[in-house]
A protein has these predicted regions:
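Assembly/oligomerization interface modules of large self-assembling protein complexes
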Residues: 10-79
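Long, contiguous amphipathic alpha-helices that act as assembly "spine/axial" helices in icosahedral shell
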Residues: 60-138, 155, 165-179
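Short conserved micro-motifs at the rims of enzyme active sites and ligand-binding pockets
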Residues: 45, 189-191, 255
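Basic/polar low-complexity intrinsically disordered segments
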Residues: 4-39, 132-135, 231-235, 242, ...
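Acidic surface patches and DE-rich sequence motifs
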Residues: 35, 125, 222-224
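Extended, solvent-exposed, turn-rich assembly/linker loops in the middle of proteins
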Residues: 129-202
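Sequence/fold signature of self-assembling virion shell proteins
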Residues: 193-271
Length: 271
């Protein structure tokens, strides 16, 4: 079935990874996840080319599927039996949209976690919930030397520049942006207002010098060790994240080997 287009996904975490790539494999190598995307040396004409540093890690990651096994509710089953052909399609489409929203929200949650270099997500097994973990990189953390409440405009600019320089030290330059928790974003807005910085507060971000700072708009649910539901975000409280926009970040959709659809697709549904 062809379901109407979903509303735009406004997740900042998901936006960072751009359009998803389809990879017709059930595995993805760790080396591919860790591949470096920096500059390479030029060579003398006629010499051998540069061998990309894909890494020697031969281990692989097996992505786990987002699988929803739903049954029509009794009240909808009654409506389904009395509905016309078009009415039946609308009931089915409502279910499919709900499932598509669940998949989107789960993808957004994984994108949030990927910003920190680790996936640590709840996974359903026959014995209950366990953790699905993937580590593919270390993220440098810096501590702001002053309290947020006393920070000046100059203090903040100095720290943002320091954060960006951590990327350039690793050979990743070019454009970048910041995502800040609500507390940090609110304080930045207060600072630029008090400093009378003209035209610094935009519709969806704040300009701190030449840096764009966005307010974290992502949240997702997880469960703690006791099984209690907790809410998480891309940024922790009083945290700001810098992300280089040309760091080679990608989102890949892999195929599953236990469903009728044998090709990699972002979403597959059947009734």
């Amino acid at each position: 079935r062809v379901v109407g287009q979903m509303p735009d996904n406004n997740s900042l975490a998901r936006r960072y990874f751009g359009a998803g790539e389809l990879k017709n494999s059930t595995h993805i190598s760790t080396a591919e996840l860790k591949a470096e995307y920096g500059n390479i040396p030029v060579i003398v004409r006629g010499d051998d080319g540069v061998v990309p540093m894909h890494g020697a890690d031969v281990s692989s990651v097996v992505p786990m599927p987002i699988e929803i096994d739903d049954k029509i509710r009794a009240v909808d089953e009654d409506k389904l039996s009395r509905a016309t052909g078009e009415g039946r399609n609308q009931i089915i489409d409502d279910y499919l949209r709900q499932h598509a929203t669940m998949v989107r929200n789960t993808t957004n949650a994984l994108c949030c976690q990927a910003h920190k270099g680790n996936i640590d997500y709840m996974m359903q097994t026959a014995d209950g919930l366990t953790r699905y973990k993937v580590h593919y990189g270390n993220v440098k953390k810096l501590t702001f030397p002053k309290t947020l409440a006393t920070a000046t405009y100059a203090d903040i600019l100095k720290f943002l520049t320091q954060l960006r320089s951590e990327c350039t030290k690793n050979g990743i330059g070019g454009p970048g942006e910041f995502v800040a928790s609500s507390a940090v974003y609110s304080r930045f807005a207060e600072v630029v207002t008090n400093a009378k910085i003209a035209d610094a507060i935009k519709d969806d971000h704040i300009l701190m010098g030449s840096f764009k700072v966005y307010e974290d708009n992502d949240f997702y649910f997880d469960k703690d060790a006791n099984g209690n539901k907790i809410t998480k975000s891309l940024c922790d409280t009083n945290e700001i994240v810098y992300r280089a926009l040309n760091a080679g970040q990608k989102l890949k959709y892999l195929k599953l080997d236990d469903v009728v659809q044998k090709n990699a697709v972002p979403l597959y549904q059947f009734t």
